[in-house]
Swiss-Prot record:
Primary localization class, coarse: membrane
Keyword Chloroplast: no
Membrane-spanning segments: 42-62, 105-125, 148-168, 186-206, 212-232, 252-272
Membrane topology: Multi-pass membrane protein
HAMAP family associated with the record: UPF0761
Family (UniProt): Belongs to the UPF0761 family.
Subcellular location: Cell inner membrane
Name this protein carries in UniProt: UPF0761 membrane protein ACIAD3168
Organism for this UniProt entry: Acinetobacter baylyi (strain ATCC 33305 / BD413 / ADP1)
Amino acid sequence: MGHYFMLNLLKKLPFYEKTWFQFILFVLRRFEADRCREHAGALTYTTLFAVVPMLTVFLVIISSIKALEPARQQLQQLIYSNFLPKSTIAFDRVLNSFTEKSSNLTVIGILFLFVTTVMMLSTIETAFNRIWRVKETRSGIIGFMRYWTIISLGPIILGSAFVISSTVASMNILSNNFAGYELSGAFILWLISFGLTILGFFILYWTIPNRTVPMYAAIIAACFSAAIFELLKNIFGFAMSNFTSYELVYGAFAAIPIFLLWIFLSWNIVLLGVEVSYALTAFHSDKIQTRHPVLMLLDVLELFYKKQKLGQSVTDLEALDIMGRGEIGRWPSYIELLEKQNLIKRTDKDEYVLVRNLSQVDFWTFFTALPYPLPLRKDVGNIHPDDEWMQKIGPALIEADDYLAAKLSIPLSTLFEAK
């Protein structure tokens, strides 16, 4: 009841049909449909066990590079200031006490921390893949090398960027005039740290999902998440600093529930950014009709058929382009159905090709292997204007519907009466 009331209320807004508002609704609907809040809760639980190992591995890699060793404390403080809210609870001191004790571990201990970090990244990948409707994760040596690259190069890139920014900050150029405006050194450093936050989100959105994510989508989603994250951090920090009654209730344990709440909110932002990156690749169609699944699959096969004639493959973006807004969520399931019938194959470039001669596949054989009913007369009329192939199959479907309606129009009582 509440859902329909809210929907009717939104439809009364003068900008309801605007593309930008429909895009926002699309993202929010998918956020709820994908149960992102539940996934954020699961990731919060995982993060609780993995945050210290990840920070420790990060600091070990930084310390192993002499050029970055002087910036370790500053870089550590940068991480805390960017990813933890300001409040009366010293989150950084609590985490420092754990990481300092963990930094004296043996090789076996460090290996354990590395495995824990890899498991954390694997959990993140699973959550991202669910949003992208990808059922398979990268396994084996490819998955391991990708995780190793993120773990090893991530700290080095951030550390190098911080060293460069510190060098620039030590110069006098940060307080000079630029285009007639007086530049603030603190503001420049904030921009640098904000840029590093964007870089972190970009690496997540671009590299973690097991599919090709367009760079522009990852960049825009990273900027969106970084802005929301910065806003939430300030609001959260202000609330925690001015409403301290929770400390009277929890006492010395006040940091635990607050830290869990912050992690939960942070993961919601991260997953919302994933939804934005997906929406940027999917929400580009002005077609609003949701067609019968069998008709949708025929439209997809037509795309593959035309591409095969040209000796080309089909990308996700090309397939999504022929779908309506209510159909794009079914694309992964359509791919799975076509693969089961050995009609298409996935290439090493995450694209798809038609691998069978469609002249040897009849419609009835294709249809009976699908988990969908036969399209009826009403379904034949609900198509897109460019579905020209419907001119051939449409009359046959209408004739089949009329035939079945005539043959099966039997009173139910007749079925149950004795002879």
